[in-house]
Amino acid sequence: MSMRIGNETFKQAVKTELKDDFMRGAVSSAQDRLRERKLKTQEDLGNWEEWRDHSEEIRQHTLANLDYYLNMLSENVAAKGGHVFFAETAEEANQYVQKVLRDKNAKKVAKSKSMVTEEIGLNEAMEAVGCEVIETDLGEYILQVDDHNPPSHIVVPALHLNKEQIEKVFKEKLGYDKSSQPEELALFARQKLREEFLSADVGVTGCNFGVAESGSFSLVTNEGNARMVTTLPKTQITVMGMERLVPTHEELEVLVSMLTRSAVGQKLTSYVTTLTGPRAEDEIDGPEEFHLIIVDNGRSKILGTQFQSILQCIRCAACVNVCPVYRQTGGHSYGSIYPGPIGAVLSPLLGGYDTYKELPYASTLCGACTEACPVKIPLHDLLLEHRRVIVEEEHMSPVAERLVMKGFAQGASHSTLFKYGTKAAPALMSPFENKDKGMITKGPKPLQAWTNSRDFPMPDDENFRDWMQNRLKRGAK
């Protein structure tokens, strides 16, 4: 899988997703549940806004000194016996991993959940050199067994499937013969995955945060699979987006606390693991060889721009969990492994406007995402800035839209045109009026996008100017 999901545009995908009542119900239920849990743990923490301010300061400071902390991280990883590779592109990262796999004659890779590896299409690259890749996060494992069904949520990848659908997948693909009870499904998956952990040659993980002062990296999970991936295979590969680091363990403590509360509404996840390099001589477990791949893949081009604050993201999906557009369309409609508001901002920056120019418009600009963000990214402002760039700099807005807006600007800028335009509007729109409703129920382009889902009011026969003049003639003040 790579960053792009499917071949449909956002508008095309939305038409399909809006008809999927189960998906919309599942997303709504999950959003409500996750949001309520987040609010509860926020209250338990107390002074939530102060924690947000502090988290924002940590992320802004780190980004402002990113070269310094990346250098510190790489030096400390190397000092602990690890190997560090800076990958400018997805291709460079994948080629490095392929080389490690070939050198180790690896046949099986156990992998924990990672958005950056999805972004660069690492699974396909590993399979291309003859490796069997096993996703060990339960949600990702379900999707992999289900013919590589793409994830629909950053934190809960199989959000769009219910337990009956998962039972069917396990029965058809793995010979499962028990019920659809979540406990039995999870136990079955656990037994299957235990075999994979024990036979894997290489373990691959993402990274929630790298810690510059010690050369460590942290993994936050509820299932414990990341610990298995990082302790059983002899070779360990960690892939990290270049912005995903903190200066010290003190900052790590703050951001992990914010991450777990914002992502799943927990004070702390079941497992918070911090690992540092390969195993030492006096240690009995852990990898014999450790590789850290630091991925740029377009991130350095965001630094120093008006979009830099998006790199503060800690991948908690709090913005996704409050987004009204995601609530109705689900994750697959975005065509990116990054859905919701974070995806609508980040995807055009990493994947380009040619592919993702629709996503900044997949927003009501209500600002709920900005209010939910634990590191105070101004998401709705960034979406507006994307729209400005698309129209003013990239000139990529639809031709019909440009013509309509140009015509409106002309009319609104000249009083005579505006006067006669408003007088003529009722007559011009009359052929499209539904006489029974007194509304336009099926309008011409570009009104069709509106009238396909709601009615459009008919212009009043008496415009405001005429109404005001008549009122003044009657002596009204």
UniProtKB/Swiss-Prot annotation:
SUPFAM superfamilies: alpha-helical ferredoxin, NagB/RpiA/CoA transferase-like. [4Fe-4S] cluster 2 binds at residues 323, 366, 369. Residues 304-334, 353-382 form the 4Fe-4S ferredoxin-type domain. Residues 443-463 are annotated as: Disordered. Keywords: 4Fe-4S, Electron transport, Iron, Iron-sulfur, Metal-binding, Repeat, Transport. PROSITE patterns: 4FE4S_FER_1. One of its GO terms (biological process) is lactate metabolic process. [4Fe-4S] cluster 1 binds at residues 313, 316, 319, 373. One of its GO terms (molecular function) is metal ion binding. InterPro entries: 4Fe4S_Fe-S-bd, 4Fe4S_Fe_S_CS, FTHF_cligase-like_sf, Helical_ferredxn, LUD_dom, LutB, LutB/LldF, LutB_C. The keyword DNA damage does not apply. HAMAP family: LutB (MF_02103). Belongs to the LutB/YkgF family. Is involved in L-lactate degradation and allows cells to grow with lactate as the sole carbon source. Has probably a role as an electron transporter during oxidation of L-lactate. This is Lactate utilization protein B. It comes from Macrococcus caseolyticus (strain JCSC5402) (Macrococcoides caseolyticum). The gene is lutB.
